[in-house]
Amino acid sequence: MIVFITSDLMMASNASAHAKQQGVKITQVSSAERGMEVVKEDRPHLLLVDLQCPGLDIEALGASLAKLADSISPLTIGFAQHVETEKLSAGRNAGFDQVLTRGQMNSQVGQIIAGVS
């Protein structure tokens, strides 16, 4: 299972199409608060985070993820446009397992999701 925090419908649609092909359930939410609720309830294998999601506090999300027990802590991948260097750095500093540019995410999303199935 995957939780995807994004308000970008194109990214969500692309990820959903790949997840469907792989037979993986994906839940898209538009806030970190809702994302954390779903993570705690459903214990996904992967959390995808659009670091450019409006209102997202990257540091607070990282702190919330760090508090999770290892048994429910998902692999966390954040992404943002390559010019958003502060957001990319914030994702790294927040302890995300991987931080990608939006272009990398677009080209690798199928492989990333296949790794969950």
Where are these regions (language model features)?
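Alpha4 helix (beta4-alpha4-beta5 surface) of REC/receiver domains from two-component response regulators
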Residues: 83-98
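C-terminal output helix
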Residues: 104-112
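Conserved phosphotransfer microenvironments
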Residues: 49-65
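Conserved phosphotransfer cores of two-component systems
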Residues: 42, 66-72
